[in-house]
A protein has these predicted regions:
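Catalytic Zn2+-binding segment of zinc metalloproteases
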Residues: 126-133
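C-terminal accessory module of base-excision DNA glycosylases/AP lyases that mediates lesion recognition
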Residues: 1-44, 64, 134-220
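Amphipathic alpha-helical segments within well-ordered protein domains
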Residues: 48-52, 107-110, 125, 173, ...
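A positional/architectural concept
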Residues: 39-59, 68
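Helix-hairpin-helix/helix-loop-helix acidic hairpins
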Residues: 55-114
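Short, solvent-exposed loop/turn segments at secondary-structure junctions
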Residues: 71, 127, 210
Length: 220
């Protein structure tokens, strides 16, 4: 794993930055270390939804908020709204929650949400269980592909997206093992620590990878 030096991960987490036009309209500043205000809010609510076990009320507005938080060049909100009448959204969310501890089954279920390609399907998993899941977005995908650490993912094939996410999840687990073996502690911030010696969750590793990928973009 020579392309990534985990000793840099604390600095990468501190360098994480995400902001779009929806932050201000929703009353949030940009998501930056150490507060990550919108991320922390989405994460807290997502964990509570998943912890219920049985979904009795469909969190449609919560999904809309995830789409608003992540809105970039490929904003899927119109596809989401247009597809709502064609699926039982509450049944899909129940399936996600039922399988949240099984990465392959969880991402397969999340991909059934209208407009939720791999980026947003994995974001939902990340907010439902940040200890176990991270978001695999286009920036991270491109950087890992260039570093030959993740295969090409074909978004037109569900099987490719599912396999790609499972590979990414395994990579994050290996990175956490390296962080643990080197006793590299996660910097203290507004988000909870994992119940481990170093405190890194997969979502934290993903955020560090996002900043790592941004650095790779600047260097290319």
């Amino acid at each position: 794993m020579q392309a990534i030096d985990v000793a840099e991960f604390p600095a990468f987490l501190r360098a994480y930055r995400w902001i779009n036009v929806n932050h201000a309209s929703r009353g949030y500043p940009g998501d930056t270390f150490p507060d990550f205000p919108w991320i922390r809010s989405l994460e807290g609510r997502g964990v509570r939804i998943a912890a219920k076990g049985v979904i009795t009320a469909c969190p449609t507005d919560y999904l809309r908020e995830i789409l608003a938080w992540g809105a970039g060049t490929n904003d899927p909100r119109m596809k989401f709204e247009a597809g709502l009448g064609n699926v039982s959204l509450i049944a899909i969310i129940q399936q996600v929650v039922d399988n949240i501890h099984q990465p392959r089954a969880a991402i397969e279920a999340s991909l059934q949400i209208p407009g939720f390609g791999l980026t947003y399907a994995s974001k939902l998993l990340r907010f439902f269980d940040p200890t176990l899941h991270g978001s695999l977005d286009g920036r991270i995908r491109a950087a890992l592909l260039k570093a030959e650490m993740l295969p090409k993912i074909h978004d037109s094939y569900a099987s490719s997206m599912i396999d790609g996410y499972v590979r990414f999840h395994s990579l994050c687990e290996r990175l956490i093992s390296e962080l643990e073996s080197q006793s590299i502690a996660r910097p203290e911030c507004s988000m909870p620590f994992a119940e481990s010696a170093t405190g890194w969750r997969i979502a934290d590793v993903e955020m560090a990878l996002f900043a790592w990928a941004a650095k790779k973009d600047l260097q290319s």
